[in-house]
């Protein structure tokens, strides 16, 4: 039998409000609407389906203060993470938000009405206090703190919700269970005791050994419930991770484990988050919850130390275990013993015993370089999934971004580089020349700084998508401003390698060899906002390569670029 929900009753607002769905939908069409962010949507889904029971809406000021200060709602119920709907003054004014007002909450992805919020109060939070009390610090290297300070808006709106529509998902539908559905699934399987395992990372043999040990220690089954909402920036995408979990599942003893996805927006809140995770798993029917080393920890702070102690989360959950109503299963790091081919918790290993380990950094290096990942660390079927999503450098897309004055030679270099890369084969080559982009992507833009920056932003977006798809991209705009170039690098590097090449041909040479007469026209005032004449050019501070067509020929410059690409493992051969 599944565990009792937190607070005694599962607050499944979808089930509660289903008889009134048509009525609520009709009302929602007439109300002002607030479009929710991705994080809001994650929170909303788990409020509406009962995953955040006993919550029935976003926190009012009384509830918020209780949670921040004491891990408790205003009625005394244990709850450790503030669930807030943040808005700005413009939204308050535009939507007429005030106590008693009703507002539709809308999905930004498909413009569907999801719920109606009845506003109870609007309040301005003390964000510094929230950061220190909830996350233990106001250090913005913590992603939860950074979000709070940089993204969360000025005011919070509290109030109860009425459910209209479920959020639409189009991936892994067979693994998406509401708390009610998962409880029914456990009952169908006849599971009496369920140990839940939280993860935001791929699982390897150590995780399998840990969860099997936990289940056997409690004579229970295992629920692998990975987060597929928002996790730590830089984490492996959930599509890859879920394929890993599915590949791993057959390695469990027959009938021991089940896999279900959790659409949670993590805060990386360490001890507080562990308590919150336990409440969520209790609502999903689990009777036990694994809390391991540095649970939901965000990594290092500004001093280079971990934000939380390795077992702080276990201490906090243990303090509230009796009231919490879900049993914590403590586990330390699992270490491999090659002489006996087994994993043991680090505190059970005799001193002097030979051990082996592969760090996360080393694993990423082996994936990048194609080096062997031994079976004692991870199963072949798991490694296969990870290698599919981590192609070798020679199989990846990349962007070569050239910047320089008009007539500096960028276009000639770009065309020659395109021919050279096409000769080598292995990936498609796309070219984004300044004039072509202006004609095809940005015909309405002028040459003000704002328009120039927008043009570079568009080039960067196209380059990032092509790079993600495995193409070699050669971009050659003037790109005169450092901030826009940095933004382009930041965007493209999310998809693959980015190389900034400064074509530093002197302005005098560019003007002297100008056969089109554009410099002369600019000097005569016929062309305005012309880079190098009446508009500035900011030389790159940290280019990956500097070339000069006055001193070099196109062939030698292309060879330099090819050598740069080859040294980064992006070309099989010269």
UniProtKB/Swiss-Prot annotation:
EC number(s)? 2.7.7.4
Q: According to the UniProt record, where is the region Allosteric regulation domain?
A: 396-574
Q: Name one GO cellular component term.
A: cytoplasm
Amino-acid positions noted as binding sulfate in the UniProt annotation, renumbered to this chain: 198, 200, 296
Keyword Nucleotide-binding carried by entry: yes
What this chain does, per the record?
A: Catalyzes the first intracellular reaction of sulfate assimilation, forming adenosine-5'-phosphosulfate (APS) from inorganic sulfate and ATP. Plays an important role in sulfate activation as a component of the biosynthesis pathway of sulfur-containing amino acids.
Q: What is this protein called?
A: Sulfate adenylyltransferase
Q: Which organism is it from?
A: Gibberella zeae (strain ATCC MYA-4620 / CBS 123657 / FGSC 9075 / NRRL 31084 / PH-1) (Wheat head blight fungus)
What gene does the UniProt entry assign to this protein?
MET3
